[in-house]
Amino acid sequence: MSSIDFMRQTLDFIHRGFRGAPEGLTEQQLHFVPEGHSHSIAWCMWHAARIEDLFFEQIFQGQPAEWESGGWAARTGLPETGFGTGQSDEDAAKIHISSLEAFQGYQERVAELALAFLGSLDEEALKREVKLRERTETLGDSINLHLVIHLNGHRGEVNLLRGMMGLEPVLLNQGG
């Protein structure tokens, strides 16, 4: 399996996990934040999609993020700016998805764009340097660290939150 195939397969698994995250949840459960320092399932979904959009569209391709170009903030009732990194617990608790259907449309669009971008690459392209704030890293390292590993961690966080509410995890018996 090539590196790109591995990335595509892993991101597809992560996408399926986030698609299933709200299944069977009430609005209250979707926005439940346990005591202490944590996030809601809604926050995890929003953050993951925004990060994926930011990296695949803006950082890797120099294009406007789908969030802005598609007018998704107005459709979903979510903030126009920000993506959750460095956000205080208080601000994270304010993330509220008012239209789950619209938000899932955004999730699907971001997933399509990400997989299309990966499909346009060859192994050599993964060696290209990409500029982040204070440093550069290879495209392959950036995809693995900021998308594959980071987003899969939040997918696991969703399952923990579901378990805290007495619900089954997403993708049970599939490496959930």
Regions found by a protein language model. Give the residues of each.
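Hydrophobic alpha-helical core bundles mediating ligand binding, dimerization, or RNAP-core interactions
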Residues: L11, H15-F18, P22, Q107-A114
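A structural signal for long alpha-helical coiled-coils and helix-turn connectors
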Residues: P22, T26, G119-D122, R162
